[in-house]
């Protein structure tokens, strides 16, 4: 099953990876294309930032079947790729060079950033505006349960 979110994540990831290969002027004008992806090959994760009590967004992609890149058990994710050289086996996207906020055909990289925030006992992935006049904060995904360590995030409908 291919979800709308997985399509957008993959597009943003692929586009960001490709854009890094061209000059900044070309990158600024590049348009991202929609390409279907298999969402089971991706894990959207709230990864702990050591010693801070906070988490950051990481996205893992299974590129080949040579070795598993991650394992999910409920809301927990085991990032298996950290235990081996994952070149040509997995991809890991850990910052805005690897993902962005898109709504429709518009890229909001310059105006929204993706952040993990705790709301009570739950972790949320939110798109936070850089300025008040840009728009509201948007909830993109949630953990759907309490978790510590590496926590799987489920995208909200439409993402």
Q: Which residues does each PLM region occupy?
A:
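Bacterial N-terminal signal peptides that target proteins for export
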Residues: 1-13
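C-terminal segment of classical bacterial N-terminal signal peptides
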Residues: 8, 16-27
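Residues in flexible loops and secondary-structure boundaries
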Residues: 9, 17, 52, 65, ...
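Residue-level detector of functional hotspots within protein domains
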Residues: 13, 28-30, 41-43, 87, ...
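Extracellular/luminal recognition modules and glycoprotein regions
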Residues: 26-82, 118, 145-159
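Structured domain cores in non-transmembrane regions
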Residues: 61-125
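Low-complexity intrinsically disordered segments
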Residues: 101-159
């Amino acid at each position: 099953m291919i979800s709308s979110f997985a399509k957008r994540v993959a597009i943003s990831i692929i586009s960001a990876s490709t854009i890094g290969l061209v000059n900044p002027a070309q990158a600024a004008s590049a348009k991202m294309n929609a390409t279907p992806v298999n969402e089971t090959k991706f894990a959207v994760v709230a990864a702990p930032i050591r010693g801070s009590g906070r988490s950051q967004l990481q996205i893992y992609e299974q590129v080949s079947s040579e070795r598993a890149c991650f394992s999910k058990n409920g809301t927990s994710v085991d990032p298996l790729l950290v235990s081996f050289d994952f070149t040509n086996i997995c991809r890991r996207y850990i910052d805005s060079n690897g993902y962005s906020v898109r709504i429709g055909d518009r890229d909001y990289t310059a105006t929204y950033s993706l952040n993990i925030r705790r709301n009570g006992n739950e972790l949320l992935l939110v798109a936070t505006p850089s300025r008040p006049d840009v728009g509201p904060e948007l909830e993109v995904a949630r953990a759907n349960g309490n978790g510590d360590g590496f926590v799987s995030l489920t995208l909200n409908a439409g993402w």
